[in-house]
Amino acid sequence: MEGESTSALLSGFVFGALAFQHLSTDSDTEGFLLGDVKGEAKNSITDSQMDDVEVVYTIDIQKHIPCYQLFSFYNSAGELNEPALKKILSGRKKSVIGWYKFRRNTDQIMTFRERLLHKNLQSHLSNQGLVFLLLTSSVMTESCSTYRLEHALHRPQEGLFQKVPLVVTNLGMAEQQGYRTVSGSCASSGFVRAVKQHRSEFFYEDGSLQEVHKINEMYATLQEELKKMCSDVEVSERSVEKLLTEVSQLKEEINRKKQHKISSGGNKDQLEEPKENVLLCQALRTFFPSSDLQTCIVSFKGRISKNCCKIDHNINIMDKLTLMVEERDFTEAETKLVTKRKVRVTTTGPKSLKKLRSLQLDQELHQDEEDCNQETKLALSSAETDEEALENPKDTNEYSYSPTF
């Protein structure tokens, strides 16, 4: 959807000069307006992705050329006096955007003569967008101390004159604090000469800034470098993606192998019961019939069985143990040592202490020979300890001669 709108800007200095000229004379005044017209397209995109383009035309009135006498360039019928008009404009014909007229004690309505004159000016100046500024003044009080000044900007549109919104710019207006989309007032001739002298240092012949051109060149170079970097980054990202895919595949393969191992071998090991050490079980049952050790659970792999063994295997433990140990383990000294221990339990007094010392010496001499078969020593020492406890249960102060384990 496209639309058009027109607005006008009038400098505060120009408006002040027009008012001063009008109030300084006793008759009506008229003249020409200089400036330019600029168009700006505003594109608004809504949520429905529809473009709303509006073209805004801004009429910037920058200067004025006064005519110090009425009917100076036209007659009473509204016909133009071209030589007089050319003399008044004097080469500024292209800068004319309209004309103005001050009237006293009248309404804000264009007269028929003014309409004819405006039409003739459009044809002579070849400007169909020519505007007409009408200013009227009236006395508000009987003492003529207060005047009312009205102004309106008229523009022909489709055969009719329509009023155009006119804004008189001033230092106190908020619009001056924002960005200006139109040019300011006409610069002085001295400023124009200074800019023209140093123009070649900042501008090219086409009017573009040199710094802007250099920045654009740097921007293009950065874009080329960025394209190269993007291609390198793309290659690296693809390699990383490939590596991540391989890693995920390896992880899946490891998980499959673990699952297969658990389903095939792991579950089988968990279901199998550990084998029972029958010889050790029978030995513990023989030498510790009334001890809590008969409920202990022993296995080859050190794992706890679900059930406790309470079966008598009917194995002659002494025969089996004799076959399992070496001959050097059963020396004469050990046989004598066992006999002496049994006799020593029944004796009391100083002789028993001497025998105890001799037995301790014998134990230290034969200590290195006791590492071959731990099960035999455990059974013999445990049996001797049980016999001593049964023979002398009340003598709690007597020193224990059995080894502690």
Swiss-Prot record:
Coiled coil: 208-262
UniProtKB keywords: Chromatin regulator, Coiled coil, DNA damage, DNA repair, Nucleus, Phosphoprotein
GO (cellular component) term, any one: nucleus
Any one GO MF annotation of this record: polyubiquitin modification-dependent protein binding
Record-listed Phosphoserine modification sites: 402
Main location: nucleus
Residues covered by region (Disordered): 365-405
MPN domain boundaries: 7-153
N-terminal signal peptide: none
Compartment(s) of residence: Nucleus
Domain of life of the native organism: Eukaryota
An annotated GO BP: double-strand break repair
Motif pSXXF motif location, chain numbering: 402-405
Cysteine disulfide partners in this protein: none
PTMs per UniProt: Phosphorylation of Ser-402 of the pSXXF motif by ATM or ATR constitutes a specific recognition motif for the BRCT domain of BRCA1.
Protein family according to the UniProt entry: Belongs to the FAM175 family. Abraxas subfamily.
Quaternary structure and interacting proteins, as annotated: Component of the BRCA1-A complex. Component of the BRISC complex. Homodimer. Interacts directly (when phosphorylated at Ser-402) with BRCA1. The phosphorylated homodimer can interact directly with two BRCA1 chains, giving rise to a heterotetramer.
Physiological role: Involved in DNA damage response and double-strand break (DSB) repair. Component of the BRCA1-A complex, acting as a central scaffold protein that assembles the various components of the complex and mediates the recruitment of BRCA1. The BRCA1-A complex specifically recognizes 'Lys-63'-linked ubiquitinated histones H2A and H2AX at DNA lesion sites, leading to target the BRCA1-BARD1 heterodimer to sites of DNA damage at DSBs. This complex also possesses deubiquitinase activity that specifically removes 'Lys-63'-linked ubiquitin on histones H2A and H2AX.
UniProt-recorded name of the protein: BRCA1-A complex subunit Abraxas 1
Organism taxonomic ancestry: Eukaryota, Metazoa, Chordata, Craniata, Vertebrata
Originating gene: ABRAXAS1
